[in-house]
A protein has these predicted regions:
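Gly/Ala-rich beta-loop-alpha elbow adjacent to hydrolase catalytic centers
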Residues: 213-217, 221, 428
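Histidine-bearing beta->alpha loop at or near hydrolase active sites
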Residues: 455-469, 500-504
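Conserved alpha/beta-hydrolase "acid-adjacent" motif
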Residues: 430-434
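Catalytic-loop region of hydrolases
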Residues: 19-128, 288-293, 302-380, 480-490, ...
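Gram-negative bacterial Sec-dependent N-terminal signal peptides
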Residues: 2-21
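A catalytic-pocket lid/entrance helix-loop region that shapes and gates access to the active site
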Residues: 223-225, 230-334, 460, 480
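Cap/lid segment of the alpha/beta-hydrolase catalytic domain
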Residues: 88-92, 127, 132-206, 249-250, ...
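Short beta-strand/loop motif that positions the catalytic acidic residue
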Residues: 421-424
Length: 544
């Protein structure tokens, strides 16, 4: 096959390259891009893709086991009323159609080394749209499973490693440009170059462009809306980790207080007793006792109800110091000087997962942020944390909010017709669900009440852990919901979601647009969504 170069004109800041003609896959290898280089372009036969092995980064004990490819730190797949597991899931690659796989290295700064991949389905199977997918944890790898899901649905898709290898923050030490890359630049540059490649391959720009991510990916999504409102027509942002260094230091502060106070640490063997007490107090508030709190905001559980009798300390009770720790876990962490909320408290219903944030080993992502960004010392010991000084150090380490995405003014995104679909597990033990409620309300307060239900919607998912997993109905096609909203202009007010055990659906429930909650109609199976109605509930506000 004769290889031919594609003539590309650098047209504007918002589009680094455009193509004068459609292309074959291999010809994309010589596509001229600004501050970027195509390193490979090859056809992949249907069902033939095998993802590369995840990177191994020495020096972070247990990182691979906790974070995994998506950086979700193992929240999915533990415990819960129905086991919470999603085992025996089919491979996302086995049924993929043939596609053109393009790998690109981006160098927007002299210290940038951002890897992206762009997958382009054959023209007959392309739906004419583009879906970028986000990362988790500290990123450091391409999100292949999410790309596969997007490709299988007919999208041209892209993902980035955000400019470093491995799901740790060690890249940040001495490399401020790499912090900028993971903060916001990598995803924007990925978006620009992916659109150029799509245009070059099909001789047509995508009709609609979407971003779909959870956790770090959720933050990446709202960062795009805040900083680059023209990049996407619609954004799915799940479990948005928008708090940056505030969130990390807030967790460290609570954890430090718990571990430094004699007898205050709550060991995992006591979690079931606390969880059972919460369910006893609040599970019936929605009219259905099913091991799931439909609206944890309405739960008024006092851990003191579990306080041990004098001289006792068993797995079924909490010592006075542990009672205070439980109250602290449920309560927002606040700046000791200003009183500002650093991160929200965990919701009732999260108890089986408390070890995700609070354990003697510490919360890995927060420790890494403190070591490599706040303290700039890889040997920093969390045991030396001093709230009086270290909270401020952490905040000053990110003076330009590179890692923080709390700006509620996304009017420019909405003015273009952009749609923001937020979702969050009420039982998320890692990115507190209160944070989603607060950001959603902040946007409405800033931009105006008229955007609620028109441009922004939030869906709180009872019983769902971090991004997925747990006893709640955590499975629904987020991209399809967003696409329907963008295409029809009709905002969803109810999404039917499923709970799967070993790949089989054993429950469906409606996920209601916040602040509504699902109410059982009083007849029919409580495992069938058609027997529930979305209705208003009185207790819906987040932390102030």
């Amino acid at each position: 096959m004769i290889r031919r170069a594609l003539l590309v004109a650098v047209a504007a800041a918002s589009m680094h390259a455009t193509s004068a003609m459609a292309a074959t896959c291999d010809s994309l290898s010589v596509l001229a891009l600004q501050n970027a280089r195509v390193t490979s372009a090859q056809l992949v036969a249907a069902g033939a893709f095998t993802p590369p092995a995840p990177p191994v980064v020495p020096g972070r004990e247990g990182a691979a086991g906790r974070a995994g490819a998506a950086g979700r730190e193992g929240a999915a797949g533990r415990g819960g009323a129905r086991g919470g597991g999603r085992g025996n899931q089919p491979s996302p690659y086995a049924m993929l159609p043939a596609f053109c796989r393009v790998a690109v290295t981006l160098t927007p700064s002299s210290d940038s080394d951002i890897k992206i991949e762009v997958w382009l389905p054959d023209s007959p199977t392309w739906n004419g749209k583009f879906q970028a997918v986000g990362n988790g944890g500290w990123a450091g790898t391409i999100s292949y499973p999410a790309m596969a899901n997007a490709l299988a649905a007919g999208y041209a898709t892209t993902s980035t490693d955000t400019g470093h290898v491995g799901n740790t923050a060690s890249f940040a030490l001495g490399h401020p440009e790499k912090v900028t890359d993971i903060g916001y630049r990598a995803v924007h540059e990925m978006t620009v170059q992916a659109k150029a490649i799509i245009n070059g391959y099909y001789n047509s720009a995508p009709k609609y462009s979407y971003f779909n991510g959870c956790s770090l990916g959720g933050r990446q999504g709202i960062t795009e809306a805040q900083r680059y409102p023209a990049d996407y027509d619609g954004i799915v942002a799940g479990a948005v980790a928008w708090g940056g260094m505030d969130r990390y230091v807030g967790v460290i502060m609570n954890e430090s207080a718990m571990l430094k106070t004699s007898g205050a640490y709550i060991p995992p063997e006591k979690y079931p007793a606390v969880h059972d007490a919460v369910l006893q107090a609040c599970d019936g508030l929605d009219g259905v006792k099913d091991g799931i709190l439909e609206n944890p905001l309405a739960c008024r559980f006092d851990p003191k109800a579990l306080q041990c009798k004098a001289g006792e300390d068993t797995v079924s009770c909490l010592t006075p110091a542990q009672v205070q720790s439980a109250k602290m876990i449920y309560t927002p962490a606040k700046d000791p000087k200003s009183g500002k909320v650093l991160t929200g408290g965990l919701m009732p219903g999260t108890e089986l997962q408390w070890g995700t944030l609070y354990s003697p080993q510490g919360y890995g992502n927060a420790i890494e942020a403190m070591k490599y960004i706040a303290m700039k010392d890889p040997n920093w010991d969390p045991a030396t944390f001093n709230a009086a000084t270290d909270v401020e150090k952490a905040q000053k380490a990110d003076p330009e909010s590179t890692l923080k995405s709390d700006n509620p003014n996304i009017k420019a995104f909405f003015d273009r017709g952009g749609k923001l679909l937020m979702y969050q597990g009420f039982a998320d033990p890692q990115v507190t669900s209160d944070n989603a409620i607060r950001y959603h309300q902040a946007v409405i307060d800033k931009v105006g009440k008229h955007v609620e239900g028109k441009s922004i919607e939030l869906f709180m998912i009872p019983g769902m852990y971090h991004c997925q997993g747990g006893p709640g109905t955590d499975t629904f096609d987020k991209a399809a919901v967003l696409d329907s909203w963008v295409m029809s202009g009709k905002a969803p007010d109810r999404i039917v979601a499923s709970h799967l055990t070993d790949g089989k659906v054993d429950r469906t429930r409606p996920i209601c647009v916040f602040p509504k909650v699902a109410k059982w109609n009083g007849t029919g199976s409580t495992d069938d969504a058609q027997n529930f109605t979305c209705a208003a509930d009185g207790t819906t506000k987040g932390t102030k």
